[in-house]
């Protein structure tokens, strides 16, 4: 999970900022218990704090939806707890480290063998294999989208309508 210890912890740098506080009417959403091991108030879904997550991670609602879908494909639902926030952070950090968009990372994640799944719990070797595969791909003429199309017949067309989180964020600011 995200480091929660001290004023310079990853949790504090992400969620205890004015930008995040401005995007959520629920400031207690990011309050930690006294032992700092979990949020004071957990929930079943990240939707109520989606605008704050978009601000904290500097991602779009499409990217947040892609992250949710990525975890659903692995049988996990992202909940409003430290584990859910950490799961979002892992995807965002890996995508940025590999200089990929979240949708590209997700597409490549669907193409690799299970032993190279970067989101396998407690398996850094799988992440290393994934990183090596991505670097090999980036050195080629293939893009993640082309490879997904060739191997899985996935089309990278995006919906032109706004995502639910975008509509909710806009309505909450009105």
Residue ranges: model-predicted function:
Residues 1-174:
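Hydrophobic/aromatic interaction determinants used to assemble and anchor large protein complexes
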């Amino acid at each position: 999970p995200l480091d929660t210890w001290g004023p310079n912890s990853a949790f504090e740098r992400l969620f205890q900022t004015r930008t995040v506080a401005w995007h959520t009417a629920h400031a207690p959403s990011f309050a930690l218990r006294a032992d700092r091991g979990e949020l004071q108030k957990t929930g079943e879904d990240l939707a109520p704090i989606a605008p704050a997550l978009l601000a904290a991670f500097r991602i779009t609602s499409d990217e947040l939806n892609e992250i949710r879908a990525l975890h659903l494909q692995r049988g996990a639902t992202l909940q409003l707890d430290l584990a859910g926030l950490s799961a979002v952070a892992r995807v965002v950090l890996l995508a940025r480290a590999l200089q990929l968009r979240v949708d590209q990372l997700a597409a490549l994640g669907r193409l690799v063998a299970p032993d190279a799944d970067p989101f396998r719990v407690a398996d850094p070797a799988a992440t290393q294999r994934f990183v090596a595969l991505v670097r090999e791909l980036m050195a080629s003429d293939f893009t993640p989208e082309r490879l997904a199309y060739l191997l899985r017949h996935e089309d990278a067309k995006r919906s032109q309508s706004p995502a639910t989180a975008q509509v909710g964020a806009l309505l909450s600011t009105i």
